Amino acid sequence: MKKADAAARARDLRERIRAADHAYYVLDQPVLADAEYDRLMHELQAIEAEHPELVTADSPTQRVSGAPSERFERVVHREPMLSLGNVQSDDELHEFDARVRRLLGLPEGEAVGYVVEPKLDGLAVELVYRDGAFTGGSTRGDGVNGEDVTANLRVVGGLGANRGVPHALEGTPPPRVEVRGEVLLFKEHFEAMNRQLVRAGDEPFANPRNAAAGTLRQLDWRVTARRPLSFVAYEALVPGGDPWRTHWEKLEALAAWGFETNPENRRCRGLGEVLAYRDRMAERRFELPYDTDGIVVKVDDLDWRRRLGAASKFPRWAVAFKYPPQEEATRIRRIWASVGRTGVLTPVVDFDPVRLSGAMVARATLHNEDEMRRKDILEGDWVLVRRAGEVIPEVVKPLPERRTGEERPFRFPAECPVCGARVVREEGEKVYRCTGAACPAQLVGRICHFAQRRALDIEGLGEKLAAGLVERGQVKDFADLYAVPFEVWQQLFSRPRKEQDAGAARELPEKSAQNMVAALERSRSTTLRRFLFALGIPQVGEATAATLARHFGDLARILDADEEALKGVRDVGPETASEIRAWTQEPQNRRVVERLLAAGVRPEPEVVEARGPFAGKTVVLTGGLSAMSRDDAKAEVERRGGKVSGSVSRKTDLVVAGEEAGSKLEKARSLGVRVVGEEEFVRLLKE
């Protein structure tokens, strides 16, 4: 692959992986199957291995996924909470073992001692104990910074699940110890909670992982307290050095202090015993009381671990082996088209319910017509289905040998199934679109986009409420949200919907309506970049919205900018400029913006402090930063009146060099440009 093509493909892969990371870790709503995610990650790793000069410090291959939510205080981990590299074959496990032996310089024939354990599917957290007392806890977040969920962790296990977070440790623990483990829902507790939801007429959770993650990240700890979360410990860290020789001794200490550890943990001598353990657990995986999609293999000797160290994202002394997804045969009942906020029709497959990875599944989506044709899927087919990554239902392939001749290919409708408008597939596009400007399904999708956390952040306004508003004719565009009568909100909240708490009395409709009105009032005060993103302008994502806001600084200037002015904005190409211009010149769109402003929505530009050491300076960031992401560092510089450039030249005023800084650092030194490390950079930000 040519370098230019490789660079473009790498950029595309990074964006797709970051979007999937955000959906999985921050929104708790996976959008990619694990196999597809792993395929994208492996492709990006291969490109970066072939072209090392294309590696960026903020590449997903260099960092742990999962940025902290803005709803919680940020906590800096004393030692990074790294994620694990994963393998899926015996060959890859052999490569891992060979690499460990090579790095340790072990003689031929000397076996490595490992600890193996089931890979738990929950939310990784860290607990801090001082003098035996629990003093704080956080999620993993991006590995460097997590979310402070102390209040919620205090009540994990409060329902007598016998797998909770101890408030005080037993025995004689060190003066300070950091305990890491997984918060999860055991199958029996998950099923009981879903039964309560169904009895109440509400929507059950899709899987235990989503339920556990959503419960732990509740703003109200009382919601967490009424749900049967459990905690299983698998790591302990002591400042100044661990007092143990092996990981197994750590696990024994954790159990002695009162923590639940996994009874399936085993010590293995050499890779042969690891493979035997893997095979036994694969046979028993669905009999276990919790969801698991693989095993974790860790070097047992702690001195060897220190010698092996870690790469930027993964420890070299551990790896996760992931099982292939469970597959079941079922018969397709029907294929139909759903309509999204941009008018795209997505084929949806309904099939006879089957149990997969502990959950009943009856529906999956196909991306587009091309995928359906490629897989040769017909209405009435028997098909193999799976929950890819144990989460997302997926149709794997048809079983043509079971066809009777009655199966029929699915044809996309000529008219929108929701509004009746014409459906088209433009030349060069893979999707069919509804052309109806007033399509209710599109409107529901646009409202959800407008209200999401990264846009105007209207807390509590999701798809069900949006659909209810559209059904009642209360909302024709975003501005109508601010004119919905209080009584209508009460009526909507009186209908069955997923409660904040499955075990408690339903919140009164009046209180819920008051909360919604308050959320709408808060959303009136927003930033220009959030407002632009919320409008759903084609090709204007978060990054482009932020760039436009910084460049123009004023909504009116953006609305009046012609294509030439828009093409002058960094990272805005001709196609994007054309899309923005077309949107801003559409009279209906202008009316919506005017009505939003009349409703009191005030999109303010972020204040740029044109003073201090960065004011008017050109700054280049190179290498990895531990205190913040590359995007955060860039935003901090720009907020202080500086400009961040991607290359070093004689016009560069300052280079910030993080870990593993490369050619940019060398060029800066050759040109005599001032270079500072991360510590000095953080100090300058505080000036």
Swiss-Prot record:
One of its GO terms (molecular function) is metal ion binding. NAD(+) binds at D34, A35, E36, Y37, D38, S83, L84, E117, R140, E182, K298, K322. Gene3D superfamilies: 5' to 3' exonuclease, C-terminal subdomain, 6.20.10.30, BRCT domain, DNA ligase/mRNA capping enzyme, Helix hairpin bin, Nucleic acid-binding proteins. It catalyses: NAD(+) + (deoxyribonucleotide)n-3'-hydroxyl + 5'-phospho-(deoxyribonucleotide)m = (deoxyribonucleotide)n+m + AMP + beta-nicotinamide D-nucleotide. Residues 609-687 form the BRCT domain. One of its GO terms (biological process) is DNA replication. GO terms for cellular component: cytosol. InterPro entries: BRCT_dom, BRCT_dom_sf, DisA/LigA_HHH, DNA_ligase, DNA_ligase_AS, DNA_ligase_CS, DNAligase_adenylation, DNAligase_N. Its EC number is 6.5.1.2. Zn(2+) binds at C416, C419, C434, C439. PROSITE patterns: BRCT, DNA_LIGASE_N1, DNA_LIGASE_N2. Keywords: DNA damage, DNA repair, DNA replication, Ligase, Magnesium, Manganese, Metal-binding, NAD, Zinc. It is an enzyme of class 6 (ligase). The keyword Manganese applies. The keyword DNA repair applies. Transmembrane segments: none annotated. DNA ligase that catalyzes the formation of phosphodiester linkages between 5'-phosphoryl and 3'-hydroxyl groups in double-stranded DNA using NAD as a coenzyme and as the energy source for the reaction. It is essential for DNA replication and repair of damaged DNA. PANTHER family: CHROMOSOME TRANSMISSION FIDELITY FACTOR 18 (PTHR23389), DNA LIGASE (PTHR23389:SF9). This is DNA ligase.
